[in-house]
Regions:
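Sec-dependent N-terminal signal peptides
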Residues: 1-3
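C-terminal motif of bacterial Sec signal peptides marking the signal peptidase cleavage site
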Residues: 6-10
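PPIase-associated folding chaperone regions across multiple families
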Residues: 13-15, 118-195, 245-353
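N-terminal targeting/tethering segments
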Residues: 13-123
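Second-shell loop/turn segments in exported
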Residues: 17-23, 62-73, 82-92, 122-127, ...
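Solvent-exposed, polar/charged alpha-helical surfaces in well-ordered, non-transmembrane soluble domains
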Residues: 30, 34, 70, 74, ...
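Sec/Tat-exported extracytoplasmic proteins
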Residues: 36, 43, 76, 80, ...
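Peptidyl-prolyl cis-trans isomerase
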Residues: 198-248
Length: 353
């Protein structure tokens, strides 16, 4: 019987079941494997030559393999540091927090369980390394940078950042094409374009004069062409970082407009007519400051990099974590490698230009 038990359990060892310990907490080996996988994915975006395996290159002056291993251990340090800050700040997980943790875990597990099981990452390890970490990290951030926190960001600072960074606008469009009775797309005739141009110029005038809102004008246009799809959009965007999602002429026009101004714009390169309204960014900021969730999102944009750097540096100073080096060293990052991870040399050189 002892021989049978030994044979059945020969591949399992309590000594290899855990990756790190701190105080009364023990992180399963799956936590380390998860972070090793994440570090490998991060490394793919850091190497100079994406057409070659990361293991054959250096990252930040380190051998690629060693960088990945070190990064995984640093992630465990950060996980424990977040736990420490969470405790120091007197925070706790509410029922809603627990539900969010369960939801995050289930969502990821639903599409990646097969791969994670293959690597040896249990669902409980995913929950600890990913879901619980995210929720605790966010609560620590909010406690530090939110109202009453030790690094509280004032409304004045938020307003200065927000109004200097974002542009609030609305628009709706008319394509140069139309749909025939068979559902096929056809180009407008010159006469049809001229008619659409006149209509859109009229909409711009009505909105500017206060006779219509942008949304109402878009609804009237949608009804006039018997369409089930609205082209109306209301957005607040950092045009310096996300302007590439819009036609260049659109961005240029928007930047040149005054707040409250409404304009008809013909963009032949986009094959569309536009009606655009540039709104008051100050009024939009008032809405943000009055909503705790939106306010925190802006603070995250302002302070996320600073907070991330501070947390990682502080985490490296933790000296009471015990790593199970014999277990950790038995996992090679090459286990995650796939041929599809490599980018062709032509694509790589094009992306770097």
């Amino acid at each position: 019987c002892l021989c049978l038990v030994s044979a059945l359990t020969g591949c399992y060892s309590e000594d290899k079941a855990w990756s790190a310990k701190r105080g009364d907490d023990t992180a399963a080996i799956g936590v380390y494997i998860y972070y090793l996988s994440s570090a490998y994915s991060e490394a793919l975006g850091k190497v100079e030559d994406a057409s070659k395996p990361v293991f054959d290159q250096e990252i930040d002056g380190k051998d690629g393999t060693q960088w990945i291993k070190d990064r995984a251990k640093e992630s465990i340090q950060l996980m424990y540091y977040v736990d420490q800050r969470f405790e120091d700040l007197g925070l706790s997980l509410s029922d809603d927090d627990q539900s969010q943790i369960s939801s995050l875990t289930s969502n990821v597990w639903s599409y990646s369980s097969s791969q994670m099981n293959q690597y040896g990452i249990a669902k409980t390890s995913l929950e600890k390394a990913y879901s619980e970490f995210i929720v605790k990290y966010q609560k620590v951030f909010q406690a530090m940078y939110g109202k009453g926190g030790e690094k509280e960001v004032s409304d004045d600072d938020i307003r200065t950042f927000y109004e200097d960074t974002y542009t609030d606008f609305e628009y709706f469009t008319c394509s140069y094409t139309k749909t025939d009775e068979d559902g096929k797309s056809q180009d407008m005739t010159d006469d049809e374009k001229a008619k659409a141009k006149t209509e859109f110029e009229a909409y711009a005038t009505k909105v500017q004069d206060g006779d219509l809102t942008m949304k109402k004008a878009a609804e009237e246009y949608q009804k006039s062409i018997d369409s089930d799809t609205s082209t109306y959009q209301s957005q607040t965007v950092d045009l310096e970082t996300n302007g590439s999602y819009y036609p260049d002429e659109f961005v240029e026009k928007l930047k040149s407009m005054k707040e409250g101004e409404v304009a008809y714009v013909d963009l032949p390169d986009s094959n569309k007519f536009y009606v655009i309204q540039k709104n008051s960014i100050s009024k939009k900021c008032d809405e943000v400051l009055a909503d705790d969730s939106q306010r925190l999102n802006v603070i995250a944009t302002m302070k996320n990099e600073e907070n991330s750097n501070d947390m990682e540096e502080a985490a490296k100073k933790l000296d009471d974590i015990t790593f199970n080096d014999s277990a950790i060293n038995s996992y090679d990052p090459k286990m995650f490698y796939k041929d599809s991870d490599l980018v062709s040399s032509e694509s790589s050189s094009t992306a770097s230009e």
